A protein has these predicted regions:
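Single conserved hydrophobic/aromatic residue that forms the stacking wall/gate
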Residues: 1-7, 11
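Short N-terminal binding/cap micro-motifs at the start of the first secondary-structure element
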Residues: 12-19, 41-44, 190
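Histidine-anchored nucleotide/phosphate-binding helix
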Residues: 15-29, 52-60, 167
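A structural motif
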Residues: 29, 63, 94-95
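A short beta-strand-loop structural module common to alpha/beta enzyme folds
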Residues: 31-41
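Glycine/small-residue-rich interface belts in oligomeric ring/scaffold proteins
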Residues: 42-66, 75-84
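Active-site cores that bind ATP or allylic diphosphates and position pyrophosphate for catalysis
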Residues: 69-388
Length: 388
């Protein structure tokens, strides 16, 4: 059997929490595929280092095949993020199980919540609409509307939210892939505390920026991976402000996730902000989560317009592979529903999703801590990481 895991974390992409998850998957599966965010991550930040270094860490942690989650899914709200990941695995045609981390740890509880959300009745819909109109963010409105039916932590904890969306995407696509979950091992998604040898992505980024040793919290040594770390989004401060000051409200309306007049607030805030972080603070209000505001701004910078997103991926891109992964890939090539990219030079199709990935990587490279390494077109030059 082939199992898959979501790989949305960005800490050189693997912490001991993920190693624990992989070890659990391997108890039930012969091989592990990871679908990993590329240059930017869902909370609206640049990934901590380049995607090839992170693919290498995934392989070092026990993954057999690393696939990139295109940025049109990675830099998106939970439903679209999950849809992209599930449809990649559906298209691949060789996956039997998907495993994701959750605060709940109960697949029955998550499936029950997902089925309720997927079959939303008009009464619940009206409640959500009313709460949002009252200035509540959509996640908070959802939690309140379902308070009598679904435990509040299912709709408020980030990994639980993604877990229910993965299950909903499986339901919508009539997928044969079976969901499994592994309880988040102590450290939550944004937890800033340390628990023995487990730390969250947020905590590890913070430690890295403070030059603290994180080797005890990851299943490899950073010097063995030889990556430039950490990438810092503040390198893009001027680029972000410049880009927004050159845009019109009409331009911004076409950008992913921009709705309800937020474009006017973003543009006016860009005129009185001097950095990405001050811009986010100036745009912030009760209706939008900070992550969503960050995603909208980055989407504007990389030219991620609404028309680029589609539920079905236009390709599957391999970032890393080992011997077991090669066997999986050989099996998939005969049945996969979309092109599989191993060498980008061989990919001749016109793909707005792929072009967006190239732009995203070009921009993300500017966040490299070493100025001479901020090269462009890495997507067109680099090959997958092969671990023998």
């Amino acid at each position: 059997e082939i199992g898959s895991c979501d790989w949305s974390s960005d800490v050189c992409s693997s912490d001991l929490g993920h190693k624990y998850q992989i070890d659990e998957i391997k108890k039930h599966s012969d091989a592990v595929i990871a679908v990993m965010s590329g240059s930017f991550v869902q909370r609206g930040d640049v990934a901590i280092t380049d995607k090839w270094s992170r693919a290498k860490t995934a392989l070092s942690s026990g993954v057999d095949l690393v696939i990139e989650l295109p940025v049109c899914y990675a830099l998106n709200a939970a439903p679209n993020f999950a849809t992209g990941g599930i449809n990649i695995l559906n298209a691949l045609g060789v996956v039997n199980n998907i495993c994701f981390g959750s605060e709940s740890g109960s697949i029955d509880e998550l499936m029950s919540a997902a089925e309720l959300l997927e079959n939303e009745n008009s009464e619940i819909s009206e409640k959500i609409k009313k709460y949002v109109m009252g200035g509540m963010s959509y996640p908070n409105a959802l939690t309140k509307a379902y308070s009598a039916l679904i435990p509040s932590d299912i709709l408020s904890e980030p990994n639980n939210i993604l877990a229910t969306e993965y299950i909903r995407a499986l339901i919508r696509s009539d997928s044969k892939i079976k969901p499994m979950t592994v309880k988040r091992h102590k450290a939550g998604y944004h937890d800033r505390n340390l628990y023995q040898n487990i730390a969250s992505a947020t905590k590890l980024r913070e430690m890295n920026r403070n030059n603290e040793n994180i080797n005890d919290f990851i299943p490899y040594k950073l010097e063995d991976i030889n990556c430039d770390i950490p990438y810092d989004i503040s390198n893009l401060d001027s680029a972000i402000i410049s880009k927004l000051r050159l845009m019109t409200a009409e331009d911004l309306q076409n950008i992913s996730e921009v709705t309800e007049g937020i474009e006017n607030r973003i543009l006016s805030s860009a005129n009185m902000s001097y950095s990405f972080e001050t811009l986010v603070e100036n745009v912030k209000n009760k209706r939008y989560t900070t992550s969503k505001i960050r995603r909208m701004i980055i989407s504007a910078l990389i030219g991620f317009t609404k028309d680029i997103y589609s539920p079905m991926p236009q390709y599957i891109r391999i970032l890393g592979i080992n011997k077991v992964g090669m066997t999986i890939l050989k099996q998939a090539k005969g049945i996969c529903k979309v092109p599989i990219i191993t060498k980008t030079a061989d990919f001749k199709e016109q793909s707005p999703q792929f072009n967006l990935d190239v732009r995203a990587t070009n921009i993300a490279m500017l966040c490299n801590p070493i100025p001479t390494h901020r090269i462009g077109n890495a997507d067109l030059k680099k090959s997958p990481i092969i671990m023998k």
